Amino acid sequence: MHKDVSPTPTAANGLESAASSYLRSARHQPVKWRPWGEAAFALAQSENKPILLDIGAVWCHWCHVMDRESYEDHEIAELINEHFIAIKVDRDERPDVDARYQAAVSAISGQGGWPLTAFLTPDGRPYFGGTYFPRDERYGRPGFGRVLLTMASVWRDRREEALESAASVMASIEHNESFSGSGGELTLALVDKIAASALAQFDPRNGGFGSQPKFPHPGILDLLLEIATNRGPGDPQAAQAHTAFCTTLAKMSRGGVYDQLAGGFHRYSVDERWVVPHFEKMLYDNTELLRNYVHGFQSFVHPDFLETAVEIIHWLDDWMTDRELGGFCASQDADINLDDDGDYFTWTLDEAKAVLPPTELEFAARYWDIGELGDMHHNPAKNVLHRKQTLTEFAAATGHSEEYLRMLLDSAQRKLLAARRLRPTPFVDRTIYTGWNAMAIRAYLEAARVLRMDSARDFALRTLNRLMAEAWDGDAELRHVIAYSPDDSIPVSTPQENVPGTLEDYAFTVHALVDGWFATGEMKFYHAAIKLADAMIARFYSLDAEAFYDTAAPAPGTAPLGALGARRKPVQDAPTPAGNPTAASALLRLEALSGRNEYREIAEATLNSFSGIVEHFGLYAGSYGLALERLLLDPVQVIVVGSGPDAARLEAVAVARFAINKTVMRIASFRLVAGGIPEVLAESLLQESEFRVPPPPGAEAFALVCRGRTCLPPITDVEALVEALEPSA
């Protein structure tokens, strides 16, 4: 357990009972904050005051800056308390609220982000907004005090103008969500257009896409890998996709955006070379990037991809998990206080000298580019550790053996990491979010199979069982939060807020349950996936829109608060995989197992709803492209039956090469009976609980390969299995 540096302030406003880490961190502020809810809106309307809405996160550096500069300033607080009803929202806890006001502020100012600062009518419609405002005018931005007085004046003296602006903004975001995007064709050509849009932005020198700032885009990376490994040798995009995927993964893991000492990725890079990151670490980034590196190793057996994947798992295990109960924590902050910018993660040359003996220092300084002049604007002596060369390239350049350099690297890494652990540690938000945990479960189960890590499998299943027990009622209700981060003054073991699950929570959890069945053969996971998928359709799918909304329709006779009245159909990955393609993909997986054609029909209709516009989303359409591949390609199920070395060899062959439409499981023979496996597999493989085509006599292990609803005879030979799994087979 690592000590987090985070205040436990005395409550001075309406956040005294808040469960969210971000809201709890503001309890001491002189601003009379209120949580999002009926009471705050009723007060605004009864006093006819506009609302000041702050949306941020506990990991957000500029949120902390604005807190200290403005919200902890008594003069600013007096202005807010006099003229506004102040509402504070945690974007991790309420992604539905955040998404709508991000769209609104982007329509007003041309950009969104955190902190989000919006001025609303008493009923919650935005009439002005922006992101970070300094207390006093600088950075080309107006001072926050002047902004507050201006917005109060607009509401008091130019109310019609404010109401017209609010109506225009709401009409804009509702129009953007009411599009009819059908009209394209659901073919692999559409997938190619999405990939071509991403490849046009590929940076061949540094990897990644675009210039700066640079984000990883895991969805588009997996789509490029799918094209690189599963298209025919004459496909013109395959080679380009291969280069883009491998270059990007290599450059990211060598950059400062990757924690060279402990593993794990920071949120994004401020430069095109991946050197200087925003230092917060997010669970969802690391789980999706873990899948990228596992899939890369699965396909190309690249040792650096393996090393990065294992290091991500070790970092998550060490810092971001509840080892006893199961569960993955949400995030780690970038900073200790506002006067540093990633100081916990960075090093001056003198700091490195104090830890390393001369030989290791000489190596570390060259390998990680540690010098007198560093990389950070606030302290030019601070270096972000990054690698300009691989260890093999470094060995060739220096004349040393790679084995000797590996010894130096391991020793220097251990010493620097031990010294870093003595520093005050950035706060870890130990809130356990349902959707993000489902993503982590998927990543761990994939890694466990490909990398043969039983510990990852065991922890993923412990977490999945906890999710089923604590976030799901066993029927239609799934909560957004499994458990909040514990607090010394408010012990929290179960959610105090019953935040309903979003589409993404349901869709990611259905995927995790399907993966739970593939990992164990236990039918409880399969049956739960079916039940939750049905609930997802009932709650979020619209027959009129032929797509999924991100939240449930309001109950009859009720009106959603504020901008929640605008319905959203998420299709772009930003930053997690989008809800509609994720839900469609989950339904396609279940259709392949259950034979329930309505799942396929809904998935196809959903993808068709966006087919006329999705190619324009480029980097943000990776999940859509993968879901479309899954729709167009026959599912491939590989079931390895048996145990021992023969089964292990067959399983190793089966998992080689990533393919979106392929799933692999190893199962005990006693489960291969009617009722012991999903309906389609039972129909294809069994006849009156006996194999339709029995395995060879005496075979201790064999593989069953099913494409669609056609299964090959049992395979015992490794070479025959390789041939059966060729993309053109």
Regions of interest found by a model, annotated:
Residues 1-450, 558, 607-729:
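Replace the tail clause
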Residues 59-63, 261, 265, 286-289, ...:
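Extended, hydrophobic alpha-helical segments in both membrane/secreted and soluble proteins
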Residues 251-258, 462-473:
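Glycine-rich, acidic and aromatic/proline-enriched surface loops and short helix-turn segments
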